Amino acid sequence: MSKKGLLIVISGPSGAGKGTICKALMKEQQFWLSVSATTREPREKEVEGKSYYFLTVDEFKSKISEDGFLEYAEVYGNYYGTPKKSVCEKIDNGENVILEIDIQGALKVKENYPEGVFIFILPPSMEELKKRIIGRGSETEKSLMTRFKSAYKEINYVSKYNYAIINDTVENAVTKINSIIVAEKCRVDRIKDNIIDSKEGKIHEQFYD
């Protein structure tokens, strides 16, 4: 199996259950959850390096010029981004990194880190998606319609991903994602260097020791 960790990028429409699945994965296995950087002010109880990396606008722009983000965007006047260095260090150390991110951000990450594992979370049906969003109790009728329209559009991006998981139950979704991770770590293009180095080492021992 591959000695390097994996970058597991999880996204999907609002209400598909991405956050719940990521929390369940974090409980089951040793994952490192990617922490975003932002230029917005810290909110109460937010912790530097755990909630976000809080940067000034100048610091953020400096990192952009240094190609320091896997992706970044400006939202309502504040910058948000996924720091490249911290993610790559964890992966090189053999840790699996989970990145829960919106679809546009995921596609940017794919451009910069195509060897990542990109998983799209789908609801069992659009009717179920509607129930989940309504069940939150935090949406107006107008915002509900906006979310539904957005979800229909976002589902069209599923073909850009490596895998699609239907979130009928969290347990089933987590089991499937864990299976994907095991399979990805056994892919020849991820482990061929380890195999070749191991073979050459054994041949060298047989002939020269």
From Swiss-Prot:
Q: Where is the Guanylate kinase-like domain?
A: 5-182
**Which superkingdom does the taxonomy of this entry point to?**
Bacteria
Cross-referenced SUPFAM superfamilies: P-loop containing nucleoside triphosphate hydrolases
Transmembrane listed as a keyword = no
EC number from the UniProt entry:
2.7.4.8
What family classification does the UniProt entry report for this protein?
Answer: Belongs to the guanylate kinase family.
Q: What is this protein called?
A: Guanylate kinase
| Organism expressing this protein natively | Clostridium acetobutylicum (strain ATCC 824 / DSM 792 / JCM 1419 / IAM 19013 / LMG 5710 / NBRC 13948 / NRRL B-527 / VKM B-1787 / 2291 / W)
Q: Coding gene?
A: gmk
